[in-house]
Amino acid sequence: MSQPPATRPRNFADDWSAAATASPPTTVANPLVEIQPGPHSLRPTSIGPRFHEIAIEDLVGAPHVDHRWGGIDLSPDGREIAFSWDRTGNNEVFVAPVRGDRIYQLTDGSDRSVWPRWSPDGQWIAYLRDTGGDERFQIWVMRRDGRRLRQLTSATAAGHRDIAWSPDGTRLAFVSNSTGHRYGLEIVEVASGARLVLSDFEHDDAQPRWSPDGRWLVFSSRRDAARTNADLFLIPSAGGEAICLDTRAGTEGESVDGHWSPDGRMIAFTTNVRGRSEISLAHLDGMLDEAGGPRGRSPRIVVLTNSIYDSTEPAWRPDGRGVVYLQARESQVAVRRVFVASHADSPVADLPGVHKFAHVGPDSETVAFLHASARRPHDVWVRLQRAVVPQPITSSLSARVDPGTLVQPVHVRYPSADGREIPALLYVPFAEALRGEGTPPAIVHIHGGPLGQHLAWWDPISQWFAHRGYVVLAPNIRGSTGYGREFQEANRGDWGGEDLGDVVAGVRWLEQEGIAGPRRVGAFGGSYGGFMTMYALAREPAVWAAGVSYVGVVSWKTLHQTTRGDLREYLERELGDPVGAAELYRDRSPLTHARSITAPLLILQGANDPRVPQSEAEQLVAALRESKTTFDYHVYPDEGHGFRKVEHRVDMLRRATEWFDRHLRA
C-alpha cells in the first residue's frame, strides 16, 4: 500500500489566497441544499433582494475540474484522487485525499495538463499535455509528489490519448494518430521510451485497457465495412492479430468502453445494439486456452442493465461482484450500481445534476466521481464507505456568486415540424434581470457534435445570458445523445435538414407560448452548433435577428480536406463519401448560401484549432464582405477548438453579449 510522501508541493487549499475565491473544500456550506432545483416555471419569477449582479469574470471565469479529457482517477490504495483543475487559470494536475482535508497542485506551466492516471503501485502519475489548445497531447510521467517529470512521447505532429498503465507498471498503452491518419493502438516502455505499434492506424482504435495478467488489451474499433458500427477487440500486448469479440452478433450498433473484471474472466462494456445504451458483460470462459491463446469461440453476452434510460461508463467493484455505471434520465445523470449475479440495481449517488467518471475504491464501497449542477461547476465528490451522502472535495464556485441567483433550467419538450418531440432545457431569467421589456428576447443555444447533449450541469454561457435578461432555449435536436440510438442517428446523412427544422421549431414554440417576442431571437453555438447557427441564418433568414458562431464549420468539403484523419472518417460516416455525396456536402454548407445571410453575424475562431481550422471561418468572412452583410470577426491566438484561457472565455462572451444587446434589443 502506498504511503503519503514526506514532502509535497504546496497545499493548494491552504495557500490559495486570491481575493473572494471560494472557501477551502472542507468548509463548503451545506452544498446539498444549495444545489436543489427551484420551482419550475415558463415565466420570469422574482427572487427579491437575493438577486444581485454577477460579474462576467466570476461566472464564465469560474474554474472547474476537467470532464472532457480523462476526468479523475482514484489511487490504487483508495486514499487519493488525481484530477485536472483550472483553478489557476490553466488546467493543471492536482491530488487530494478522499477525506478532503488537503489539495495539492502537482504541475505548474503554461500548457494544458489533463488525463492523470495512477501507476499500479501508486508512486507515479501519467498525464497528457498539449500546447496552445492544439490537442497534440504528449505523454508525461511524474512521481506522485510532482517531482521527476519526464516526457515519454515527443511526436509533436501527433496526438496521444486514452492512456492506461500495464498491471506491472512498466508500460503504458495508448492510442495516437502518429501516422497523421486515424488513431491506432501503441505501447510505450516507461523506463526507455521504446514504442511498440499494435495496429495499422486504419480503423480509429480507442479505449485500450489491460487484462489483469497483462497479456491482453481490450479496445474498441470500427472495423466493419460500414464504419457506423463499433465492436470490442482483444489483442496480445506483445503484438499479434486482433480478435473481434463479436458482441453485436451481426446487428447494427456500437459496443465500446470495455473494462476487465478483476479476475479477468469478464469484460463489462457499453452497447446500444438494442436501441438504448446499456451495460453488458462478455463472459470469456472457454474463449481462451490455458496458454492464453484464442480458441475461436465467441464470448457469452449477458445484458446487465435493463432500462428505458441510457446507461454508460461501467467501472468494476474490486471485489468483482458488480459494477457502478452512469444512467441518464432526461437532463440528469446519476451513479448507480448493479450486481453481476442478481442484477440487483440501486442508486449510489443521485444529486441533482450530472455525475461522471465514477471510480470505486478498494473497499468496493467508496465511490469518487465528478459532479456538476446548473448552479455549481464540475467538482470532485466522494461517497465514503458507509456514508449516507457524498461530500465535495473541491469547491470551484467563487464566494461572490450566490448559487440561488443562478437559474435552474426547466426540462421541456416541443413539437418539431414532423411531429417528433424535441427535448430541451429552458433558462427563464428572474424578473429582476429583465429590462422592462415585457416579453424578453431569446437566444437558442445549439450544442456541438452533433453527438452531444445539453444537460442540467454547469453551463456558464446560458447562465450568463439568462442573468442578462435573455430567455435561453438549449435544444437537444435529433442527432443528440441521451435519448437512444434511433434519435442519435436520426440526422445521419441529413445535417442541416430536419435538425435545422428542430431548431426553427424551437423558435416557433417560444413565440407561440409567449415566452419570447418575434424577431427578437438570436442563434448561438460552437463547432457543429456554430455550423447550425450560420446555416440557420442562411436558410431561415426571417427567423433570426442575430447570430454568434464560434469555431463553426462553413464548408463540409473544405473541412474534409483540412481536418484530422479521424474527423474525416467521422464526416464520411455521418454525411457520406465526399465524392458520392458531393451535392449534400455543397448544399448543407453555410458558405454555399452566404449571400442569404441577412442577420448580423459574429464569428469567433481559435488560431490553433485542429478540428475546424481558421481557414473555415475566413472563407465565410470573405463571402460576407462581398455581400455587405453586417458581421464581425475575431481570432484568439493560442486557442484551439474552444477557448481554454479565462481571459479569452470572458472576452468571447462579452463580445457575444454586446452583439445580442445591439441587435436583439435595438
Segments from the language model and where they lie:
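Active-site-proximal cap/loop segments of hydrolase catalytic domains
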Residues: P475-A666
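Cap/lid segment of the alpha/beta-hydrolase catalytic domain
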Residues: S396-R519, G526-S527, V554, L559-E569
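Beta-strand-rich domains and repeat architectures in extracellular enzymes and scaffolds
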Residues: E57-E92
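Short, solvent-exposed loop/turn segments at conserved positions within beta-propeller repeat blades
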Residues: D86-N91, G132-F137, N177-Y183, D224-A230, ...
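Multi-bladed beta-propeller domains
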Residues: Q3-S23, T27-V28, I35-R68, V95-R112, ...
